[in-house]
Design a protein with these regions (language model features):
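Conserved phosphate/ATP/ADP-binding segment of small-molecule kinases
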Residues: 104-187
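Short pre-catalytic strand/loop immediately N-terminal to key active-site residues, enriched for Gly-Thr
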Residues: 190-201
Length: 273
């Protein structure tokens, strides 16, 4: 991650305080809202189809998280996503547990036919399911789960990221032991971080929100998503150091994530300009 890049993104966020319309997972709703506040933005969480277009219109970006789906929620995601597309606002799709059921696969396919995401943030299993839905290859019935159980080789993750990015014509961030970001033309591997990020519920959901926030700046989609992914790994690394220094547990690690992220973005926004 370029230091200048993250400083410029941080400055822009703190200047404009982007509002993110989050149609998100109720399991992680509070963490997503707190993450956005810590990073310098804010969340609006309207999810009824009677209001989602109106809310989308006064926000700066839209996050579509399909965790805990039902028919009404998917319809609301479609309406909000289409409105964001029409306004030229960034849309991030987080296809939580995409392969967990036939219902989820069918509804996700419906969503993808109606809305064009600017970026997708997913785990390895979800990326495989996305590619299978979009290309009619592989067997999606083999895949499932909100937490990825796949352990693909680095080269294979890169290929899946590139395939998904090309099929969707967007930037894709696949998270795991190492993260891979690709727009189909350029691909980068992100390393570092702390494995404890995978021991808390919502680490991926929070990263998806951070990607949405970073996309609300004058930065290319690839650079914005790459910067968000790299910063989240740096945040986890420092949160882990503080947790270890205190000889504390996973709950303290969770809390430190918010503190560290706020400090990193406040520092960079103040010291560049």
């Amino acid at each position: 991650m370029s230091l200048n890049n993250i400083e410029e993104i941080s400055f822009c966020i703190h200047q404009n305080a982007p509002k993110i319309h989050c149609l998100t997972n109720p399991v992680t709703m509070q963490d997503v809202a707190n993450l956005l506040l810590a990073a310098g933005g804010s969340a609006v969480m309207g999810q009824d189809e009677q209001e989602v277009e109106e809310i989308t219109s006064f926000c700066h970006g839209t996050l579509l998280n399909t965790g805990v789906p039902d028919i009404a929620k998917i319809q609301a995601c479609i309406l909000a996503g289409q409105k964001a597309n029409a306004l030229g606002h960034p849309v991030v799709l987080d296809p939580v547990g995409a392969g967990a059921s036939t219902f989820r696969r069918k509804e996700l396919q419906k969503l993808l036919q109606a809305v064009h995401p600017t970026a997708v943030r997913c785990n390895q299993e979800e990326a495989v399911v996305l590619c299978s839905l979009l290309s009619d290859t592989d067997s999606p019935e083999k895949h499932g789960g909100v937490e990825s159980s796949l352990q693909m080789a680095e080269r294979d993750v890169c290929l899946i990221a590139e395939q998904a990015a090309s099929l969707l014509n967007c930037t894709v961030l696949i998270t795991g032991k190492e993260d891979v970001v690709s727009d189909g033309k350029q691909t980068q591997i992100l390393t570092g971080g702390d494995s404890r990020i995978r021991q808390i519920t919502g680490g991926g959901c929070m990263l998806s929100a951070l990607c949405t926030l970073f996309l609300c700046t004058d930065t290319s989609a690839f650079d914005a998503v790459r910067a968000a992914g790299a910063l989240w790994r740096e945040t986890a690394l420092e949160a882990g150091r503080r947790t270890d220094a205190e000889k504390s547990g996973i709950g303290s690690f969770h809390v430190h994530l918010f503190d560290v992220l706020e400090e990193k973005l406040m520092y960079t926004s103040k010291h560049k300009f």
